[in-house]
Amino acid sequence: LRVEKQAVSADGTALVRAGQEIEYTLRVVNVGSSTLRNAVVSDPMLGLQDAAVKPSTLAPGQSGELSVKHTLTQEEIDSLSVYNQASGTATPPRTDTPLEPGTAEVITGLSPPSSLLVAKRHEPLDPERASAAGDTITYYVDVTNNGTRTLVDVTVADPLIDDARHQVGDGT
């Protein structure tokens, strides 16, 4: 018995954000010389425990399969991959004892973009008078994460500002 597993984006696009779906196809292949019955797969991440493949009775060389979707979490996006393992078994003729489980694993690489948008602005100066040396100019630097990965320890450096104070927003 051989277990195979394949993962593809359910909508055919790159896997880049939480909420997208991966479609897993789990396949059990009879590589022996006897017909096997009750072919099932188990995959804890996908919530499968002894789920029957179709067909569940497999002649030599025949395979049965089952497809299941998994919705990506933000944690998976941030880790850049999803590791998943499945097992499968079937029962040979003239016994009620299933074969030792075969296993298959797949690591799905994710490609979320990391991107920051930085915008710098200042408070308007008094339009009634000319600017002079020593005037205080208040600058604002807005940093927005417009990618799909969670970013941590983001810092802003500006060589023109020597005593900058910062206020952290909501982190999104």
Q: Which sequence ranges carry the predicted segments?
A:
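Exported/extracytosolic protein signature
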Residues: 1-172
